[in-house]
Amino acid sequence: MPKSVIIPAGSSAPLAPFVPGTLADGVVYVSGTLAFDQHNNVLFADDPKAQTRHVLETIRKVIETAGGTMADVTFNSIFITDWKNYAAINEIYAEFFPGDKPARFYIQCGLVKPDALVEIATIAHIAK
């Protein structure tokens, strides 16, 4: 089955050759998402909660553009720059997944911009 490119209205141009999301066979693949403004500047430097909220709101827009909801999320890959932000990120994360939680993993690493604190890539299965 062919894939569909998912680009929500108002999305900024990516820094590299990719799109915000793709849809294939009822599965939405959301690219790694950071807290960027329309010009790819990092938002909310030094605020892991605000960055996480912005990232998850952006992911929600991609999934909703594809016809799904956050309840359809089955897996998240979470990249953080410092373990000291783990609890703050989890606090906001829990607001977006109040029911059954998706599977996920965390990894500490450097991100594309120094002020970025969290990046999340997502997979969602949309019921037909």
Curated annotation (Swiss-Prot):
UniProt KW keywords: Hydrolase
Enzyme nomenclature, EC number: 3.5.-.-
Listed GO biological process terms: nitrogen utilization; uracil catabolic process
Domain of life (superkingdom): Bacteria
Record's catalysed reaction(s): (Z)-3-aminoacrylate + H2O + H(+) = 3-oxopropanoate + NH4(+)
GO MF, any single term: deaminase activity
CDD domains per record: YjgF_YER057c_UK114_family
A GO-annotated cellular component: cytosol
SUPFAM superfamilies: YjgF-like
Quaternary assembly: Homotrimer.
Protein purpose: Involved in pyrimidine catabolism. Catalyzes the deamination of 3-aminoacrylate to malonic semialdehyde, a reaction that can also occur spontaneously. RutC may facilitate the reaction and modulate the metabolic fitness, rather than catalyzing essential functions.
Family under the similarity heading: Belongs to the RutC family.
Protein name as annotated: 3-aminoacrylate deaminase RutC
Species this protein is from: Shigella flexneri
